Design a protein with these regions (language model features):
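Sec-dependent bacterial lipoprotein signal peptides
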Residues: 1-20
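Extracytoplasmic metal-acquisition and chelation regions
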Residues: 9, 19-318
Length: 318
């Protein structure tokens, strides 16, 4: 934490230099309210809720150059933008602890909304092969005011959570710059979420196998899927143990799935090894998108990417 505070201080000192030539900062119209998002999903939700009213706002996403959220290093410009936000929407996990430091060091006066403070967060078990429908007790979800280090950060990958988040964000935006259209747009967007969710009913064998990290626990919970993964959450581990490799290979051998999964930025070498060790053939390696490192310019929205993810699961869960 000391190191992080030193970094924050250094960034603060650098701000005077950074004021010149800042991209998003120079585009902030001081006459408009500003909403700042740290992730792609939040940013897309805000745009859909605002609709045509987006022209009345400065809508900014930091970390829009494709950097993974778990390794993102905030810039001096990020710090200044946060200080100017009327609404700040962020994930709230340990990867964004710097956000808390930024709000404190910049005397943040806006309204902050952390996703993990407005859902039932999932605790990351420190294991590698696990059936994903083991739910924690409500006591384990008491987290407000405490570190989120032990919780899965990828709450946006639950369509059920997305509905709650959008409703909250709509109300929050209305508090800052009232408009009757936010609620209407939000309801229309939630209808689309419900429609998407209703298209996918997985019956029979509901095992999914990830020869990679596993940021999709929230999605698995939505559809009551069993999951087996090489690493829990977005673990920093890079080498799967022999026991993990053996377990994944055994599950592949037993289930004979049409495919096993890796993340959008994942290396498929482990997946190839798992398939080879299983002795099975004609098993596809399928990528799914966690939306945690999407660069500016992405033409697909949250719902389109979630539909692609669910279609990928459907290939295996027939």
């Amino acid at each position: 934490m000391k190191f992080k505070k030193i970094v924050i201080l250094a960034l603060s000192i650098a701000m005077l230099i950074a004021m010149t030539g800042c991209g998003d900062l120079n585009r902030i119209d001081e006459s408009k309210p500003t909403v700042v998002c740290t992730g792609f999903a939040q940013y897309d939700w805000v745009l859909n809720i605002l609709g045509d009213e987006a022209e009345r706002w400065n809508v900014i996403r930091i970390n829009d150059k494709g950097a993974d959220m778990h390794s993102y290093q905030p810039s001096a410009e990020d710090m200044i933008i946060i200080s100017k936000a009327d609404v700040l929407i962020y994930t709230g996990g340990m990867s964004e602890e710097w956000i808390i430091d930024a709000m404190e060091s910049q005397d943040f006066q806006g309204k902050a909304y952390a996703l993990l403070d407005h859902c039932e967060p999932i605790c990351i078990e420190d294991d590698h092969g696990h059936e994903g429908h083991d739910h924690e007790s409500s006591d384990e979800h008491e987290h407000h005011g405490h570190s989120h280090d032990e919780y899965d950060e990828h709450a946006w990958l639950s369509l059920k959570n997305a509905k709650m988040f959008c409703e909250d964000i709509s109300k929050l935006l209305d508090e800052i710059y009232p408009s009757s259209s936010y609620d209407k747009n939000c309801k229309n967007y939630i209808d689309k979420i419900d429609e998407l969710s209703s298209q996918f009913v997985f019956e029979g064998n509901n095992n999914i196998i990830f020869a990679d990290r596993f940021p999709f626990r929230y999605l698995a919970e939505d559809f009551d899927l069993n999951w087996y993964a090489a690493f829990p959450g977005c673990s920093a581990e890079t080498e799967a143990s022999f026991d993990t490799l053996k377990e994944l290979s055994n599950v592949v051998k037993e289930d004979r799935p049409a495919g096993i999964f890796v993340t959008e930025t994942g290396d498929d070498s482990l997946a190839k090894t798992v398939i080879a060790n299983s002795g099975e053939q004609n098993i596809e390696i399928i990528k799914v998108n966690s939306m945690q490192s999407i660069p500016k310019g992405e033409v697909r929205g949250y719902l389109e990417i979630m539909e692609e993810n669910l279609n990928a699961l459907k290939k295996v869960l027939k």
